[in-house]
Regions:
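Short, low-complexity disordered leader/linker segments with a strong preference
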Residues: 1-53, 75, 428-434
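Extracytoplasmic "Venus flytrap"/periplasmic binding protein-like
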Residues: 72-139, 168-180, 281-282, 303, ...
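Glycine-centered hinge/linker elements that transmit conformational signals in sensory
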Residues: 191, 233-264
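Hinge/lid segment of periplasmic solute-binding proteins
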Residues: 111-164, 186, 192, 213, ...
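Extracytoplasmic/periplasmic substrate-binding proteins
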Residues: 56, 115, 250-333
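Periplasmic solute-binding protein
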Residues: 118-122, 141-178, 197, 204-233, ...
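C-terminal capping/gating helix-and-loop segments adjacent to ligand/active sites or protein-protein/ligand interfaces
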Residues: 83, 232, 320, 358-369, ...
Length: 434
């Protein structure tokens, strides 16, 4: 998900007439008090009331096509106005503030894991909506499934992250092999620099990017994501025990050498633009950015480079998970409409077109044959099918992860913190993780 912008955008999308009673039949996966919901709609139609559905998310990609999708939903639901707030920077803080003030959105998005769990007590349990649940891949649904069997969120799309490189730039520089160590990556950087290309454009201004980057070097593949986090929380492992942690600082030293202080000044959009236009060769990002890359450089050929965290190909990491889950406020006055909205966005053909064309991502549903066309999601599928991906650590951590570790990494890049300072900061974070 990722996903982050430096602005808060609120858009209200409206239609004019009244809510159609016949729409429910088309949404066969919707359950609940159908007759009472239809009666309410009929009464509102007589009274000329407009229903406002409040939606909150932290998206930064595919926004324009999402707005078009919402307009279609409104057209199919006369009398319904979807009021959506895109809070792509500090989304967790803004959503928490709304919840604390009693202004809870009807539908809200969170990253699966710690982010979504914060709102389970407010969330509708989908576990009895069997027809709807059958439309999603089981592995994706399990991300919000509790030990008791409750399901508090519906999955959006799969997202994969690693280093992303411009294939044309690599070809022009004569680079034919991807690196299997930080040292080999350093040699590639030298070659790129000698060809007049900035080797790495790291969005170091973004704490979330830095936090995600660090997880590649935290990952212990023998434990996968959950096992690694649990071992660090319990004290069974320390950062000195992690097989590739020291190489994280070798990687950051490359960034310091080839990107300098500029790294902590660069946001996600300028970094993506630099790689899309060939000004830079690599950055750390996910396939959620494919639509932006396509817009910035329509003919640019991109691919994933598994992060060379160790000394051999089998050590390399590429991390994949579901980016966002849709949660519905269980006490929403528009509960059935909110459920219909989620099903429409996530399972309809219109929704599938948005996910595969507007965002260029792989849907977590099993109801469409549509697939993304971009280089990155297609490349990601190869790694996923080959079993060469690991899960996400940052979403298992609590929502303070990026805000805690991001400044530590920025401080190292600026020469303000030592390797020992940063490592101690990470140690303290995981020891205090609940």
């Amino acid at each position: 998900m990722k996903k982050m912008m430096a602005v808060l955008v609120a858009t209200g999308l409206s239609a004019s007439l009244l809510c159609s009673c016949g729409q429910k039949a088309a949404m066969e996966g919707t359950t609940g008090n159908g007759s009472s919901a239809e009666t309410k709609k009929a009464e509102e139609k007589k009274e000329g009331k407009e229903v406002t559905l409040k939606v909150f998310d932290s998206m930064a990609y595919g926004i324009e096509s999402y707005d078009e999708l919402i307009k279609k939903f409104e057209e199919q639901h006369p009398g319904v106005k979807v009021e959506i707030q895109h809070a792509a920077n500090d989304g967790n803080t803004i959503l928490q503030s709304r919840v604390n003030s009693g202004d809870i959105p009807d539908v809200f998005l969170n990253e699966p894991g710690a982010g979504a769990k914060l709102y389970y007590e407010y969330s509708y349990d989908w576990s009895k909506d069997k027809d709807l649940l059958s439309k999603f891949n089981e592995d994706a649904l399990n991300l919000t499934k509790t030990d008791e069997g409750a399901i508090y969120g519906l999955p959006w799309t799969y997202e994969t992250m690693a280093l992303i490189y411009n294939k044309d730039v690599f070809d022009k520089a004569g680079i034919k092999e991807l690196p299997n160590s930080v040292e080999e990556l350093g040699e590639i950087c030298k070659t790129l620099k000698s060809n007049g290309v900035q080797p790495i454009s790291l969005p170091g201004k973004e704490k979330w990017v830095l936090g995600q980057l660090a997880t590649h070097f935290i990952m212990d593949k023998s434990l996968d994501a959950e096992g690694t986090v649990e071992a660090l929380k319990s004290g069974k492992k320390t950062f000195k025990d992690l097989p590739h942690w020291d190489n994280f600082f070798k990687f950051l030293d490359l960034v310091k050498e080839y990107d300098g202080d500029k790294a902590v000044e660069t946001g996600w959009e300028p970094a993506e633009n630099a790689v899309a236009t060939g000004e830079a060769a690599m950055l750390h990002m996910g396939d959620w950015a494919q639509a932006n890359f396509t817009k910035m450089g329509p003919d640019t050929k991109l691919a994933f480079m598994p992060v060379p965290v160790g000394t051999a190909a089998e050590d390399n990491t590429i991390l994949s998970s579901v980016g966002w889950v849709f949660q519905v406020y269980k006490d929403s006055p528009n509960l059935e409409l909110a459920k219909e909205y989620c099903e429409y966005v996530l399972c309809s053909e219109d929704g599938a077109k948005w996910m595969t064309e507007g965002v260029d991502a792989v849907p977590a549903n099993n109801t469409t044959e549509l697939q993304p066309t971009g280089d990155l999601p297609q490349d990601a599928q190869k790694y996923i099918k080959a079993g060469k991906t690991n899960g996400w650590i940052h979403t298992i951590c609590d929502t303070t992860y990026s805000d805690t570790v991001g400044p530590l990494i920025q401080g190292y890049l600026l020469g303000e913190y030592s390797k020992e300072d940063v490592t101690q900061g990470f140690e303290d974070y995981f020891k205090n993780l609940k």
